[in-house]
């Protein structure tokens, strides 16, 4: 393993020395120096993690931190708009991306939009992911939100929830979503199992919003043109925070996590308080921030394995939400088991 890591790191380093910091014109979108250094930084972070570094060799964490610093020195910056950054190839936050255009587009929006719009609801978000988004005051959501007589159990959350997930009653592509079923159990909203193209409804009654171009028209000739982001500055900040924590520099770790939380506030100062924890509580905060900030960006699967926490977080019962619309228009919420997962440690590592 060490030999493989050394080879990969050396290849990325060589590439970074040959590539320019940016491309313009018809070459825009090609791999840059920043992309090579970012991939090197990710590789070194993985190599320093508990799965591959059981002795907690500090020199590996120091190498990961230094690699992240090399990327940060190139002048990238956090985009002010968390939702829109995934739609703009020119975002100052994007380090490595795959571009699309009118001729060579993709079907992401069709695959993941609601059945009521004509989509396939392919990414049905789990209740546990929805409830990973904090309340505005920084506390975690109370399960009682779904059993009390509330009109909106998703109100007052981390704004990243609304940029990442579509919940019942929220606007999506200009229309209020209807994941609910009527109390007769035979009819329901347009996005429910009784709605349009019922076979394509979301089994959890949530869908992904992140990466969606909500201005896309319902035409098979109109493919998605937004980029797929492989790496962005927020990941590098989180990589750096994690590495610095393990290097014993908790103040720096908190600083970089809080840069991300500041952006998540969307200009408000009264929500999502700064991370102030120390010790293992700080590490848990870093890991949690990574789960939320990088949700659906193909990190979590690898993160829980390199941290060796998969048997704690993935060996569980997972849920969706049923929403019943009463005759008076009020809605009743009930969580239901959708899947039971197992993870056998250490075999599955």
Task: Give the ranges of each region predicted by the language model.
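C-terminal substrate/ligand-recognition segments
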Residues: 158-262
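Domain-scale activation on soluble regions of proteins
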Residues: 19, 68-70, 257, 312
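Long, intrinsically disordered, low-complexity segments
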Residues: 7-9, 85-146, 153, 223, ...
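Flexible helix-coil transition and linker loops at the boundaries of alpha-helical arrays
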Residues: 18-29
